[in-house]
Swiss-Prot record:
NCBIfam families for the chain: glycerol_kin, PRK00047.1
Annotated protein name in UniProt: Glycerol kinase
Binding site residues for glycerol: 82-83, 134, 243-244
GO molecular function: ATP binding; glycerol kinase activity
Protein's organism: Clostridium botulinum (strain Loch Maree / Type A3)
Regulation (activators, inhibitors): Activated by phosphorylation and inhibited by fructose 1,6-bisphosphate (FBP).
Binding residue positions for sn-glycerol 3-phosphate: 12, 82-83, 134, 243
Lineage start: Bacteria, Bacillati, Bacillota, Clostridia, Eubacteriales
Binding site for ADP: 12, 16, 265, 308, 409, 413
Record-stated family: Belongs to the FGGY kinase family.
Keyword Transmembrane helix: no
Amino acid sequence: MEKYIMSLDQGTTSSRCIIFNKKGEVVSVAQKEFTQIYPKAGWVEHDPLEIWGKQAGVAGEALNIARISPEQIAGIGITNQRETTVVWNKRTGMPVYNAIVWQCRRTAGYCDELREKGIDKTIKEKTGLMLDAYFSATKIKWILDNVEGARELAEKGDLLFGNIDTWLIWNMTKGKIHVTDYTNASRTMLFNIHELKWDEELLEILDIPKSMLPEVKPSSCVYGETDEILFGVSIPISGDAGDQQAALFGQTCFNAGMAKNTYGTGCFLLMNTGEKAVDSKNGLLTTIAVGIDGKVEYALEGSIFIGGAVIQWLRDELRMVKTAQETEKYATEVEDNNGVYLVPAFVGIGAPYWDSYARGTILGLTRGAKKEHIIRAALESMAYQTHDVLKAMEEDSGIELKALKVDGGACQNNFLMQFQSDILGVEVDRPEVVETTALGAAYLAGLAVGYWKDRNEISQNWAISRSFAPAMEDEKKEKLIKGWHKAVTKAMDWEERE
């Protein structure tokens, strides 16, 4: 009986299930979008019950599409939107509030208060993260402080916290297992990435009971088995990693200095730094890349909040395009950006600037500016932001990048990939299998159950679909980058501080 690995890929806008074979090829995909909830400006939420329902639904669907039985699944890997925070009652299994999404800025003011007390230095030292509303810690605190009765329940030991991976595993095992992996834990702003444990001092500062937190385990190990009610059989849940770390693993960036960029809702650039946690002097995050083979490996990460989301905005709010694919056609219908720059700081701006008060701007408009120029400027913004992060990474790590591996939806846009290569001045490699996030989770799950032997076997699966080489003169490139940096300064510190 041929065996497969199932990957549950729980993203920011959709829940997906992808089934892979031994060669790391996609056998089937099922996907369902779910509701984005915006209660106030800058606030973003999801319904955890809807996420669980849709995730369970696509798992069954993917099996049907592949025409295989649950018995043929050797293991399940989970990858998830990171930082998004769920708090639920362990007795009833019901969330006490909606999931607060990583993009949500509601705790920015509280982060400012902590910064004034100098807590940001402690946080960076212990967790490798910047003090920011992006991470889970202040979201948990917000729920405890603002949801009626939540703090009392938490003090009694009745509330559990989890990122989406933990929430899914808890539901898949019918409440038997409350666990996360090193990569997800490293994004909470509560986990000491050097000592590999929840940090008592940070829990005290934020007033979060330790009893709420899941057990932290490696990214590749058997956490437990699915309850039979789900598939009719028990299947090992054997891999777990946050989406960006899973993509780094799926891109087989196993050695220090190897890097990938995922062009999803946000853009995420990660560079493997091996067993050394490199402290960033340039506004990047030091994070755990993977916990495997009895050790952890670290990465530098630059988080760009708005990547592909700028295309959704062109499509849904401005109605300039009907589909994301059309952006490539429009961008290539004009020779250049005509001096137009779009800074998509809709929810502030991430690495290496970290300004919660920046807002989106379109600059350099003249009477000759057309829809095509704005669309082109939107695509170019992803490449410029990636450039800024990469330069910071090279400076921190002392490693000059030779090539960049790419994945995520927008990496299918050939105009963007060529422009990215031009602006970076390095080769950009798009792999055959672009489902690298789900693939990384599958690899982690498969290694834990012996489906794949080791990382060498996995590396042989990676193949280039298309390579983009830089073709822009340096002078033109420098001029464009200079214009971009000028535009970013105009977007910063726009929103009034309360």
